[in-house]
Design a protein with these regions (language model features):
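Arg/Lys-rich low-complexity patches in intrinsically disordered regions that function as generic
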Residues: 18-27, 54-60
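Gly/Thr-rich phosphate-binding loop signature of adenosyl cofactor/nucleotide-binding cores
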Residues: 53-170, 364-425, 440, 462
């Protein structure tokens, strides 16, 4: 692989790496001096800031403000333990040690810094020891909660999965992962129960079909989400596939972008359905038509959820497909150099956007990194079709694509192998995952659609799902995740089946999305679901610890059913136990149907309803 050869033969300084921006061409010594001077004066400010009042003594508080670890302002001195580990050795460099040493000497030989930090640069997390409940999160360290097996995240980047690729993924699951395989809401595949001894063979199989795991975790550019119908959609504005390929070829797996303040998430879509949750990414490229410049992308920045949710904001800038890769590269360097590194819970791109505003972000991007202005451009138009692509749809080439709904993204290697067989039988060589934990089979001849739908139905994958099967997502949960407090996949699957049965007597006016997360990190996007359930531990009246779920209601992203994105409201004091989840959601849904005004969706009702109606 290109990145593996590269990292073994070349040591690139992250400030002077390939394709230098205008900023990175500056003299290093001058930059270091300027950084030191600026650090003494405080964080960098835009040219438009108000000058200091004359003859006024500087504020002692401001003068003594702690550095935030911005490389371009404070220099490169590590300000926390994670930054020390990254400065000592890039996460990319652990790969040869995994292949040549740890796979032979075993789990117990792996040093802590590699195991709990650098392994992540290759998509590896130690999974949770079986049997540990949520209280262990407070009483045991990360290492103490770690089993001797790994979650392996496989980078897909929205790419088509050929039948050959799909069979390789299936073989990795069945041969090494105890038949586990989960589609994530970033279109990746996660396999559990991975032994370090098997990693060289797993990576060999992936690389033989053009797949890899690089930067699927860690403080690096994470795997991209992309429209799962890129290049085939009958309504597509612009195809992002060449842009993604250019970025992967030039920068993914290079040291220039492998030491960021935190993770950096990217999405691309040229489909008018807005099918990639663009409001939740660090940078988003959304297809639009410029009145003079033609098709291209509208740029958004600063999205993310977790405990401090922020929705991405438009920069108001337009780029063509030919410019998009360069702009992505420039933006990630802005984040690398100016992102806040001192506190990890304040180190995401959204906090830089919050501190600067999009006007300053765009100015720094253009002036310091691109060296030219970007064109102003239009905002995306409101979507008129659902973005989950479930069901049968036309392609631009006259063929069909069909979207199927696994239950909360859970598959298996056995099922993946049978999906490959069904797709091949239908004449397809193109299967894709979606950002909603769904699966598409593309390039199907019209006369083979019915047989494909029937074959997939036998695998438990339906093209015509009932409402909650279609609109429910869940994270990994306490089954494997060390951060989780509660279960997710199993209770969500039970809820889906029960709710679709219990509510078969009603007709919903639109989709009600139900997202379940096992902790506050919101990997399953709870704050932007109609009904979001966040796992937590609470006390019973008798003082016993129990699993419960905090409820968020009325969140959502722009869709064919919603004009504006927004976060859900929480219901004060409401804690729903696992046994009560189905009853609660059924009760809530029926109240919505009873109390809604004409043409009122669930989110609108949830935000105006009295709290008693939401309990």
């Amino acid at each position: 692989m290109r990145w593996h050869t590269w990292l073994l033969i070349k040591d690139i300084n992250p400030m002077t790496a390939s394709k230098p921006s205008p900023r990175s061409r500056k003299d290093a010594a001058a930059t270091a001096k300027a950084s030191t001077d600026q650090a003494a004066a405080g964080p960098a400010q835009s040219p438009a800031t108000t000058p200091a009042p004359p003859a006024r003594k500087p504020s002692l508080k401001k003068a003594n403000k702690r550095p935030e670890g911005q490389w371009a302002v404070d220099g490169h001195e590590p300000l926390n333990a994670n930054e020390v580990v990254k400065a000592a050795d890039d996460g990319l460099h652990v790969r040869p040690r995994i292949i040549d040493i740890y796979s032979k000497t075993g789990f117990d030989s792996i040093p802590e810094d590699d195991l709990q930090t650098r392994f992540r640069w290759w998509g590896l997390y130690t999974q949770r020891k079986p049997g540990l409940d949520g209280t262990a999160n407070a009483t045991m360290s990360d290492t103490e909660r770690s089993d001797k097996y790994f979650l392996q995240r496989i980078r897909i980047d929205g790419m088509p999965l050929s039948i050959q690729r799909l069979r390789v993924l299936a073989s990795i699951s069945t041969d090494f992962g105890r038949d586990t395989a989960d589609i994530t809401d970033r279109q990746n595949l996660q396999v559990h129960w991975i032994d370090v001894a098997d990693l060289p063979e797993i990576w060999r199989r992936l690389e033989s079909v053009g797949l890899d795991t690089v930067h699927t975790a860690g403080d690096a550019p994470r795997a991209f989400t992309a429209s799962p119908v890129a290049g085939v959609s009958a309504n597509e504005i612009v195809d992002p596939t060449p842009v993604i390929a250019e970025i992967r070829e030039k920068w993914i797996g290079t040291e220039e972008v492998s030491n960021l303040p935190r993770k950096f998430k990217t999405c691309f879509t040229g489909d008018p359905s807005l099918d990639v949750a663009h409001e939740l990414n660090d940078i988003s490229f959304v297809g639009v038509r410029h009145p003079e410049l033609g098709p291209g992308f509208d740029i958004w920045a600063g999205g993310g959820l977790s405990a401090n949710p922020h929705l991405a904001e438009r920069l108001g800038a337009f780029v063509t497909a030919d410019e998009a890769a360069e702009v992505w590269h420039a933006m990630i360097l802005v984040f690398r150099d100016y992102g806040f590194r001192r506190l990890r819970n304040k180190a995401r791109m959204k906090f830089l956007v919050e501190a600067w505003g999009v006007e300053k972000l765009r100015d720094v991007l253009e002036r310091e990194y691109l060296g030219h202005k970007l064109a102003d451009g239009p905002a995306p138009e409101a979507p008129t079709e659902p973005g989950d692509h479930i069901g049968v749809h036309d392609q631009k080439n006259g063929r069909k694509y069909v979207g199927f709904a696994p239950t909360v993204g859970r598959l298996s290697g056995t099922i993946l192998a049978k999906v490959a067989d069904a797709a091949e039988k239908a004449g397809s060589d193109d299967v894709r995952f979606t950002p909603y934990q769904k699966l598409l089979v593309l390039d199907v001849e019209p006369d083979r659609v019915d047989q494909l739908v029937a074959d997939m139905e036998e695998l438990g994958l339906t093209a015509h799902p009932k409402p909650f099967r279609r609109n429910t997502m869940a994270c990994t949960g306490i089954e494997f995740c060390k951060q989780a407090f509660t279960e997710t996949k199993a209770p969500a699957a039970r809820m889906v089946d029960d709710l679709d049965t219990r509510l078969a007597d009603v007709t919903l006016p639109g989709p009600i999305t139900l997202n379940m997360n096992g902790c506050p990190h919101s990997c399953a996007r709870i704050q932007v679901a109609d009904i979001g359930l966040k796992g937590q531990l609470t006390r019973t009246p008798e003082g016993e610890t129990q699993q419960t779920y905090q409820v968020h209601l009325g969140g959502g992203l722009v869709s064919s059913n919603r004009d504006d994105p927004g976060l859900g409201r929480t219901v004060r004091g409401l804690k729903v136990t696992p046994d009560d989840l189905t009853d609660y959601v059924e009760r809530l849904t029926r109240r919505f149907l009873e109390q809604r005004a004409d043409d009122e969706g669930f989110a609108q009702w949830a935000h105006r309803a009295e709290e008693d109606s939401l309990r």
